[in-house]
């Protein structure tokens, strides 16, 4: 019994380290993306940056959840609240991106080229799958729906990186102004789905474990 408790504490500590890294990485990623996106007028890049800031919120709530892992009642209560906070944040972001991307499409407003955005998307494609896999292992070992949801969130960030990179490259290479708002619009249902599942408190990461 004591050995199992100590092992669980060790796993929870590993989860905390992953969330500290998530907060640090996504703060940097979000700042670079939002600043570069604002300078280039890229809604997909700004949306990607805001998604990174939501991951910061998610990381902070997961740290909060991990801090009471030994207390079953508080753990379950924090677990549900963590999922809802992340879910609401996702829905708000989906609404914002949908509005801005449709506005840009109707106004035929394309962004300027963003080398910083392209580099950021490539780096994110390397970092996020590794982070998602590590979180998924911790979530599986702890039986934590909130950690599993956060792992899935990191995995979806990889998908968003692919969409972002595609839009930026198409615009840079072919001059397709509509590629950026279209990329942002494609992100919207993915983000909204994650938000709805978070609010419902669903464990979204069985495949990540």
Report each predicted region and the residues it spans.
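Alpha-helical transmembrane cores and adjacent cytosolic helix/loop segments
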Residues: 1-209
């Amino acid at each position: 019994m004591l050995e199992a408790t100590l092992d669980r504490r060790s796993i929870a500590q590993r989860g905390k380290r992953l969330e500290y890294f998530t907060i640090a990485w996504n703060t940097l990623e979000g700042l670079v993306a939002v600043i570069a996106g604002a300078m280039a007028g890229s809604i997909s890049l700004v949306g990607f940056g805001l998604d990174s800031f939501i991951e910061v919120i998610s990381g902070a709530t997961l740290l909060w959840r991990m801090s009471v892992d030994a207390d079953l009642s508080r753990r379950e209560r924090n677990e549900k609240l963590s999922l809802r906070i992340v879910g609401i944040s996702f829905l708000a972001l989906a609404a914002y991106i949908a509005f801005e991307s449709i506005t840009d499409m109707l106004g035929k407003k394309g962004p300027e080229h963003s080398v910083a955005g392209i580099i950021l998307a490539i780096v994110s494609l390397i970092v996020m799958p590794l982070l998602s896999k590590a979180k998924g292992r911790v979530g599986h070992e702890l039986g934590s729906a909130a950690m599993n949801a956060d792992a899935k969130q990191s995995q979806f960030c990889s998908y968003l990186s692919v969409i972002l990179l595609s839009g930026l490259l198409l615009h840079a290479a072919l001059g397709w102004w509509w590629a950026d708002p279209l990329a942002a619009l494609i992100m919207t249902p993915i983000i909204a789905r994650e938000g709805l599942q978070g609010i419902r408190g669903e464990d979204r990461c069985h495949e990540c474990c």
